[in-house]
Amino acid sequence: AIVEVTPEGIGRNPGKLREIAEGSGVHIVSGIAFYDQSTYPDWVASASIGTIADYFVKHVEEGQEGVRAGVIGEVMSHNEAVANPSGYRLEPLEEKVFIAAAQAQRRTGVAISTHASLGRAGHAQLDTLERAGADLSRVVIGHCDAHWHEDIERDLSYYLPILERGAFCQFDMIGWEQLMP
């Protein structure tokens, strides 16, 4: 199976995924989420957390174009390179979407996949999801390899606390030569 988490606003296309899956025989799990704030649908800023959660739940339970989402993701918080990951904070609108993702996860049982590159935002994302009641054993922190260092201890100091909290680290930047030549 392939988990495909292109969010709304930057090319999510459930109908095309279905066509590819049927043509190839490969099971594709589609995600539902929003990317960065510049690509959020206009209604998100004024919507309640519950309304956003309902939107995610509807995509999981009913689907779009005959395809139900099997994961909430890729849920993103802004890319900000910070020297100390503990200094990273989600912006208020991002926090609202993360809380909605946690609520939708509790209602549906599906996993959450995040976008946490550059700023090493995984800890702040997990903090928000945990406060909102998410099951961290069903959370994947994406792009953990986006800031690979020669100093493995520095990297482990980021990865191990994520794993100790029960979440998963996703290493998915393989082949992106601009990042890791």
Regions found by a protein language model. Give the residues of each.
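Conserved residues at the C-terminal ends of beta-strands
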Residues: 5, 75, 142
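Gly/Ser/Thr-rich loops at beta-strand to alpha-helix junctions
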Residues: 6-11, 117-121
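Metal-dependent catalytic neighborhoods of phosphoester/phosphodiester hydrolases
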Residues: 12-19
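Short, surface-exposed alpha-helical segments at coil->helix boundaries
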Residues: 14, 95, 122-123
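Active-site core of metal-dependent hydrolases
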Residues: 107-181
